[in-house]
Amino acid sequence: MSGEILEHIELETGDEPSAAVIWLHGLGADGHDFEPIVPLLELPDALAVRFILPHAPEREVTINNGVRMRAWYDMNPSQGHADIKESALQIEALLEREIERGLSSRRLILAGFSQGGVIALQTGLRYRRPLAGILALSTYLHDHARLADEYSFENLDTPIMMAHGLMDPMIQIARGVSAREELFKLNYKVEWFEYAMGHEVCPQEIADISRWLTSRLT
């Protein structure tokens, strides 16, 4: 575990939160991207949750002609794996920080969209403490061949919600389906949702996420 805590936004749905959701944005966005989603979830009044929305570091991104932008990793194969491992360590540091603040790891959920979903899966499946769940939206599984050797027994029973757009032009739904099947092979519990949308989030998905979060945290 190394490095400073990532810059982030914190939103609390009530006093003295009893749970936390760490939600990772996609390529080129920042923590503000999912800030408007939090009130739309309309979580129960009795469920006080701290939402932590970190900003990815800025780095040179090959598909952006090397221009620096916020990204959890460069999709260049020669650099991507190292970036993903680095980002996973940074997210682990956020998880550990919530435990230091008094929350059980079983009250923590990792969530992510697109690139953020890759990091949520990369981190959560290998984390050495049991989590409340992993939420992976419009995303895929990085280097699934290594997962069988690296996954954490502590999180083998962690519920996973995956959701994807049928018309996603950025990360085709076939990649999400492939990730789901790889997780099934390792006996993970995956709930799968798909929607008539592109690379985005839709109202029905928000409602489904709300129900899933509530079921995991109450």
Locate predicted features.
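C-terminal catalytic histidine-bearing segment of alpha/beta-hydrolase fold enzymes
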Residues: 160, 177-218
